[in-house]
Curated annotation (Swiss-Prot):
Domain of life: Eukaryota
InterPro entries membership: Leu-rich_rpt, Leu-rich_rpt_typical-subtyp, LRR_dom_sf, LRR_domain-containing, LRR_R13L4/SHOC2-like
Swiss-Prot/TrEMBL LRR repeat ranges: 33-56, 79-101, 102-124, 125-148, 150-170, 171-193, 194-217, 219-239, 240-264, 266-285, 286-308, 309-334, 336-355, 397-420, 423-446, 447-469, 470-492, 493-516, 518-539, 540-563, 565-586
Sections of the chain in a coiled coil: none
Protein name: Leucine-rich repeat-containing protein 40
Pfam families, per database record: LRR_14 (PF23598), LRR_8 (PF13855)
TM region(s), chain numbering: none
Example GO biological process: intracellular signal transduction
Keywords annotated in UniProt: Leucine-rich repeat, Repeat
Length: 601
């Protein structure tokens, strides 16, 4: 007999009710379903689901009248609970409350119908793991859907949904979510609670941005945001370490996203945007990339750093404004497909372009060996060449305004690294992943142009006061160091927009941060911060992202709820009791609302 209790759903005549003779579902199908636990009614032109389907495991079947012997071969009373029900490609306009009469359902597929609503009782299907509702006319979902906490796969594509409530964050076991082809204008920050999500499709909506909290989805492998209205990608997207496929086609992007932590990214699709420039900073971390699609953009040239993509197999540059190619492109060992149609290439003969990728790469390789007037041959090292200079990309300094001396495991930055700047304006400095115990004093040489500095993954214990001379700084990354405080002189950084202090040794929130009104992002997770001053925090009127997760905060001040500029507030992993976890998983808006409700009146 079934393991599910049915008493609550059985009426007094259930045992004597006969299945209707005019049921549009063949009796043989129902009989087989009782044995197999599966029923496929797809493509049968149904305008409604017969009651006999919902009551499949409740009513006494017809064969009971014909055979009541316990010794019979057809043991009709030994039925299996229905676990899989397929109703796709019919003409259903509604699903009745009786759907709750199938509590053992694991798979429910109702795609390609005419549904405009669902009953709230769908939330009673506690065993449901896969719910397919695509290609219908749904404008919203009942609250019952968000009670399906065992759900692993939810398909809602091709509907008319305009908003997803923050209750989405309750579906913590989801590993696949498809919201494509709807009318969504934003996504709730509670999406970040879906820590098991592997595949997320948001394509073909009206999204202008992604919630910063999306960076917390550490298991996400595929993200599709194609055909939206996004002009930029939040920097925190770079923290998605498991991402393998990223689709950003048909948006309004002007630059490739910087993805320094996406070490496993294999496919990056950015076609049909407004990208004009490719910079070394966008390419150097994409070591695992096998496919880069940039067709139908406005790219004018390829940097020499394209050769950093040693795993690249396919490069699509169709319909851009490229007039020449770096000869180093021919040295990429795995490149099998290079699409260049629709570019004003003048330096390469047309007949060569028609011979295919292999011949073109062979030609480019042959040009690498030509004399320096081709601009490609490296200058030989001499006895006067310092070892550190051999590691510096001078081309990046001059053309990309980037000084990169990262991942060298050096305890100091040699002077000749700064000498290589040679008066050129530098906007980006990356000294991360070394063994630095102090900030190089010559960093102030770059004070007139430096906007972004990365000193993460070192052994810094202090930040010098003369850091305040870097008046153009907009972004500081100090993650994974040994810092316990910041100097008050940093309040002079009037252009600073983001600071990353995660994985240090702060025991209190740095007082100076309250005095930098330009701040938009503060990430100080995984420290030992014991509390925050909500009144001072409110003075940061531009602050939109505040990550305080994994600290020692015992009490969250209710006044923090008045920081209405916050769009992403991360508090998980702290020892406080309130707000409770049930509030936290609902997202930033719910947390702020809860905190405001606790303010004494």
């Amino acid at each position: 007999m079934s393991r599910f209790k049915r008493g609550a759903h059985v009426d007094s005549g259930a045992g004597f009710r006969q299945e209707k003779e005019d049921c549009p579902v063949p009796y043989g199908l129902l009989k087989a379903a009782r044995k197999s636990g599966q029923l496929n009614l797809s493509g049968r032109g149904l305008t409604e689901v017969p009651a006999s389907v919902w009551r499949l495991n409740l009513d006494t079947p017809q064969e009971a009248k014909q055979n009541v012997s316990f010794g019979a071969e057809d043991r009709w009373w030994e039925q299996t609970d229905l676990t899989k029900l397929l109703l796709s490609s019919n003409k259903l306009q509604s699903i009745p409350d009786d759907v709750k009469l199938l509590p053992a359902l694991v798979v429910l597929d109702i795609h390609d119908n005419q549904l405009s609503s669902l009953p709230d009782s769908i939330g009673d299907l506690e065993q449901l793991q896969k719910l397919i509702l695509s290609h219908n006319k749904l404008t919203e979902l009942p609250s019952g859907v968000w009670r399906l906490t065992n759900l692993r796969c939810l398909h809602l594509q091709q509907n008319l949904i305009e908003q997803i409530p923050r209750d989405l964050g309750q579906l913590v076991n989801l590993d696949e979510l498809d919201l494509s082809n709807n009318h969504l204008i934003d996504i709730p920050e509670s999406l970040a609670n879906l820590q098991n999500l592997v595949k997320l499709d948001l394509s073909c909506n009206k999204l202008k941005s992604l919630p910063p909290a999306i960076s917390q989805m550490k298991n996400l492998r595929m993200l599709d945001c194609s055909r939206n209205q996004m002009e930029s990608i939040p920097p925190v997207l770079a923290q998605m370490e498991s991402l393998e496929q990223l689709y950003l086609r048909h948006n309004k992007l002007r630059y490739l996203p910087e993805l320094p932590c996406c070490k496993t990214l294999k496919e990056l699709h950015c076609g049909n945007n407004q990208i004009e420039v490719l910079e070394a900073e966008h390419l150097k971390h994409l070591n695992a990339l096998s496919l880069l699609e940039l067709r139908d953009n406005k790219v004018k040239s390829l940097p020499e750093e394209i050769t950093l993509l040693q795993g690249l197999e396919r490069l699509d540059l169709t319909n851009n404004d490229i007039s020449s190619l770096p000869c180093g492109l021919g040295t990429l060992p795995k490149l099998k497909s290079l699409s260049l149609e629709g570019n004003p290439l003048r330096a390469i003969r047309r007949d060569l372009l028609t011979k295919g990728t292999g011949e073109l790469l062979k030609y480019l390789r042959s040009r690498v060996q030509e004399p320096p007037n081709g601009g490609l041959k490296e200058e030989p090292k001499t006895a006067m060449t310092f070892p550190s200079q051999a590691k510096i990309n001078v081309h990046a300094i001059k053309t990309l305004k980037t000084l990169d001396y990262s991942e060298k495991q050096d305890a100091t930055i040699p002077d000749d690294v700064f000498d290589a700047v040679d008066g050129n304006p530098v906007a980006n400095v990356n000294f991360s992943k070394n063994q630095l115990t102090a900030v190089p004093h010559r960093i102030v040489d770059l004070k007139d142009s430096l906007a972004d500095i990365n000193l993460g993954f070192n052994k810094l214990t202090t930040i010098p006061a003369d850091f305040c001379h870097l008046k153009q700084l907009m972004h500081i990354d100090l993650r994974n160091n040994l810092l316990i405080s910041l100097p008050m002189e940093l309040e002079g950084l009037i252009k600073l927009r983001s600071v990353i202090l995660s994985f240090n040794r702060f025991k209190s929130f740095p007082e100076v941060l309250y005095r930098i009104p330009s701040l938009e992002t503060i990430l100080i997770s995984s420290n030992q911060v014991g509390g925050i001053d909500a009144v001072q925090m409110k003075t940061l009127s531009r602050l939109s992202t505040l990550d305080l997760s994994n600290n020692d905060i015992m009490q969250v001040p209710p006044e923090l709820g008045n920081c209405t500029s916050l769009r992403a507030l991360m508090l998980d992993g702290n020892p406080f009791r309130n707000p409770r976890a049930a509030i936290l998983i609902k997202g930033t808006d719910a947390v702020l609302e809860y905190l405001r409700s606790r303010i004494p009146t």
